Amino acid sequence: MDLEQMKVRQKHIRNFSIVAHIDHGKSTLADRILEMTDTVTKREMQDQLLDSMELERERGITIKLNAVELHYHAKDGETYIFHLIDTPGHVDFSYEVSRSLAACEGAVLVVDAAQGVEAQTLANVYLALDDDLEIVPVINKIDLPSADPERVRQEIEDVIGLDASEAVLASAKKGIGIEEMLEQIVQNVPAPDGDLEAPLKALIFDSVYDDYRGVVLSIRVVEGTVKPGDKIRLMNSGAEYEVVEVGVNSPKPLKRDFLMAGDVGYLTASIKDIQDTRVGDTVTNANNPTAKPLEGYREMNPMVYSGLYPTDNAKYNDLREALEKLQLNDAALEFEPETSQALGFGFRCGFLGLLHMDVVQERLEREFNMDLITTAPSVTYDVELTDGTHINVSNPSEMPETPLIKQINEPYVKAEIMVPNDYVGAVMELCQRKRGTFVTMDYLDDYRVNVIYEIPLSEIIFDFFDKLKSSTRGYASLDYELDGTRPSDLVKIDILLNGDKVDALSFISHRQFAQARGRVIVDKLKTIIPRQNFEIPIQAAIGAKIIARTNIKAYRKDVTARIHTGDPDRRAKLLDKQKRGKKRMKAVGTVDVPQAAFMAVLKTDEEIK
């Protein structure tokens, strides 16, 4: 293909993402687009086609971004090349959205005709506007009995500030409005304008490990071209490789002779070293490199930390390999080695939220056959010591002793909650219970309110989202961002079994709830830990002060069953012997702690507040 033909092809490329709140119908819309452009036959079609992970289908959510190439025959008689990137909608995966948008010129904004604009809709639109993308608004689910497209059109204009007079009215389920939307993409989304003759410059926006081909990079070519046989350099790590294969996903991988500026596809180069490839890095030609790399992504800081331990310590290295491979595909995951007296060797992992943590754990168990123990999640505290130094503590067992601490600062988030008028009281009550500070409240229209609170992150990560949904019958939506740290009256609570601290059960709590929480956990552990042949005391302690205690009663073998009842001396002797044996057993006996005990620390909030 000569340069002129390439330029003509480039004018016909449209790169766009679909962004929306959870459950507003992104994946169904993507399915209809694939059908409409004959990318997949009716026989191959299945729901959530782009959600290729088994976990995504089961939960009905999108976790990973996914890029496909489609060909659309427009009304002007031309054939256009669409690169569609499907994105997740849940707040935990907003990092995936920002990565997708960096590879696009346009975004299709899907808004539910019944629910209207929600918190995550706003968050994702702002991400798109930050990247100067052309936005095509689509009001989906107009076939629902409760749909009110005109109200939603007004909301898009008032709340987001977009012109919605041209908004497409669609029903992805019934295939209504899909063609009109595709025509709007052709008209409104600009073609990529990268220089075809410049040195290669491509953005890595995703990667996955393949046992046979090594690391497969998903790239958006910004300038220049790349073909098999080219020598490439990854600008961040400086590593150089020879390209083995390039191609596009449609949705199955299709080999191509080359990828040019504007294309979104994949590249393999027998990359075996996982550390060389970072999402957000720039790929360039090793013999004719570009002067400066592309601006990558803003790094996402983990919000929640948890320990992951293999149940069999011999599997420690397997867990490391599994985490490294997962990190390729999930750039927001962080991990570092740690040891626990109770659980042995494992990793302290950082996640964007509880759903993210849940998904990572499930992927490790399914895709890598790992058997794991997970400790209760915690956040990073900024601890100021009496000598004036500051340390960051994300593992409760690393918290210094009380006399050494001058002050503990805990991270806060600014939470934006969109909620119907009728449920404002319930939301405010929940936020107060979670130690939230009221900031402001805006009425978006006659039906809905945007409530803003500052809440400690540690209160959000447990069950805030579930409680919010249940107290508003599922109508409230939440978006949050970190908002610095504030001093708090926090204490570390240790759990002692048979007099020994179990470091993995330690947790940090506000002093106000410490006693109640210690009591609940002690009682809960009593029901979870199996009985032994000796009595086990379970204690909760702040420093040396015991704040709650209970005992697990010992099994009792009836040693007097075989003797004659009329021999009190013999009876007393046997009972005394049993007592001495149990005392000895108690001194050397260790207590096995089941996985459920570590999760019990999580579930205590319920019973306290």
UniProtKB/Swiss-Prot annotation:
Binding site residues for GTP: 23-28, 140-143
Pfam families tied to this protein: EFG_C (PF00679), GTP_EFTU (PF00009), GTP_EFTU_D2 (PF03144), LepA_C (PF06421)
SMART domains (UniProt xref): EFG_C
Ranges where the tr-type G domain occurs: 11-193
Subcellular location: Cell membrane
Main location per the UniProt record: membrane
InterPro entries in UniProt: EF-4 (IPR006297), EFG_III/V (IPR035647), EFG_V-like (IPR000640), EFTu-like_2 (IPR004161), G_TR_CS (IPR031157), LepA_C_sf (IPR038363), LepA_CTD (IPR013842), LepA_IV (IPR035654)
Keyword Cell membrane: yes
Family: Belongs to the TRAFAC class translation factor GTPase superfamily. Classic translation factor GTPase family. LepA subfamily.
Protein's recorded name: Elongation factor 4
Biological source species: Ligilactobacillus salivarius (strain UCC118)
Gene behind this protein: lepA
